[in-house]
A protein has these predicted regions:
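A generic structural motif
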Residues: 76, 88-89, 114, 155, ...
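Short, compact, well-ordered microdomains
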Residues: 83-93, 182-191
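Short, surface-exposed charged micro-motifs
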Residues: 84-86, 112, 169
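Glycine-rich, flexible loop motifs
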Residues: 13-83, 90
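Intrinsic disorder/low-complexity segments
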Residues: 7, 11-13, 18-20, 29, ...
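Extracellular attachment/recognition segments
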Residues: 45-53, 57-65, 119-201
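Coiled-coil-like amphipathic alpha-helices with heptad-repeat character
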Residues: 11, 82, 106, 190-193
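Glycine-rich, low-complexity segments
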Residues: 1-39, 90-123, 145, 201
């Protein structure tokens, strides 16, 4: 029939994915992520210069050599939530680690892979507390070196804050969030996610 025998196919495919990774070899251990500059797949166990101190996880390195050579590192942590981080080295200078999809814990600032006007975008989830009763309420967002608001989303009582009929106005400046309501919605709690740039970049 012209079809290859099953044994022939199995032999041709054997050892094409050593250790099951499909990346040419098992992950090589690395103790300092700054030293992982050759393209490859690495394992980290208490490694330095990772997204966290004593980083445990995996690292994928893509390296381009030559003039203006660039290295990209993608890291995934093995402990806790499986977060994905990215950073680059251009001419030997490393950028900070950035989140691809931050876990958005309340009150924590995350530097993301997004850019706005060639500046990194940060994200922070904020608990505003109870909505105001037919008045306005100011809450500090606690962001240092706030530069430009890029976008925001919000929930009030489990519904979209921006489209809520009881909300007249939402104002966000370098220090505070102000929400103005036209009726008593104080039984509802408000949560917002701000995306912004910083003056330090």
């Amino acid at each position: 029939s012209g079809e290859p025998e099953a044994e022939t196919v199995a032999t041709a495919l054997s050892n094409k994915a050593p250790a099951g990774y499909g990346l040419g070899a098992a992950a090589a251990p690395v103790t300092d992520l700054n030293q992982a500059v050759l393209s490859g797949w690495y394992s980290c166990a208490g490694s330095s210069n990772g997204p966290s101190s004593n980083f445990y996880g995996w690292l994928l390195v893509s390296s381009r050599t030559g003039a203006g050579g660039m290295i990209r590192q993608d890291a995934w942590n093995a402990l806790g939530q499986p977060d994905h981080f990215v950073r680059y080295a251009v001419d030997g200078v490393w950028t900070p680690w950035e989140y691809v999809n931050p876990p958005m814990q309340l009150g924590v600032e995350y530097r993301t892979v997004e850019q706005y006007n060639s500046k990194p975008v940060y994200a922070k989830a904020i608990s505003f507390g109870q909505a105001p009763n037919a008045t306005y309420k100011d809450v500090s967002h606690g962001i240092e070196n706030f530069s430009q608001l890029v976008s925001y989303t919000g929930m009030m009582g489990g519904a979209n804050l921006i489209e809520a009929s009881g909300v007249d106005n939402i104002q966000i400046n370098a220090s505070n969030i102000r929400i103005t309501t036209n009726t008593d919605v104080s039984a509802n709690y408000v949560y917002l996610v701000l995306r912004y740039t910083k003056t330090t970049d």
